[in-house]
Regions:
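Structured binding/interaction patches within domain cores
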Residues: 1-124
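C-terminal binding/interaction regions
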Residues: 111-156
Length: 156
């Protein structure tokens, strides 16, 4: 969390988009190969961040990703992947959504690797390993002494 608050919203968003596209979209696609909503949400978020579309259009596609997650209620991996992607895409309008990538994304990866019925301790350990990978990815793109850090209110 300490590194998150030192980075700009665009750095946080781009890192979340990249990770989601590389790691989580394939997990979603494994179960829903014809389900475009998570990919559409990431595309819309990138377009909004670059100024090509307005927030309401991006928000509509992001909300569709969240709907896809709800519809995948019986598939823990796909549901968690779609939730993480939706949170990643939502980082464009509120930087604090970037934490959803770690929460849902690590769970998706752990459940995919070990199965949803794996012992909780093993799932937690695998999720922690994935969170460390996410942190390493952020470290790679982080800007030391970022002049415009995101103003994140964690609401807790």
């Amino acid at each position: 969390v300490k590194l998150l608050v030192t980075q700009s919203k665009s750095t946080l968003a781009n890192r979340a988009f990249d990770y989601s596209g590389r790691v989580l979209l394939p997990l979603w696609g494994k179960y829903y190969p014809d389900g475009p909503r998570p990919q559409n949400a990431l595309k819309a978020a990138r377009e909004w961040l670059s100024g090509r579309i307005k927030l309401p259009e991006a928000k509509g596609r992001i909300l569709q990703c969240h709907a896809a997650a709800r519809e995948a209620e019986n598939n823990h991996v796909a549901r968690s992947a779609a939730r993480a992607i939706g949170q990643s895409a939502s980082t464009v309008h509120s930087a604090r959504h970037c934490i959803g990538l770690a929460l849902y994304g690590a769970l998706a990866v752990a459940c995919n690797a070990l199965g949803v019925d794996a012992p909780r301790e093993r799932l937690e350990r695998r999720a922690a390993e994935e969170c460390e990978r996410m942190l390493d990815a952020l470290r790679e793109v982080s800007i030391e002494n970022e002049p415009n850090p995101a103003k994140i209110d964690w609401k807790c």
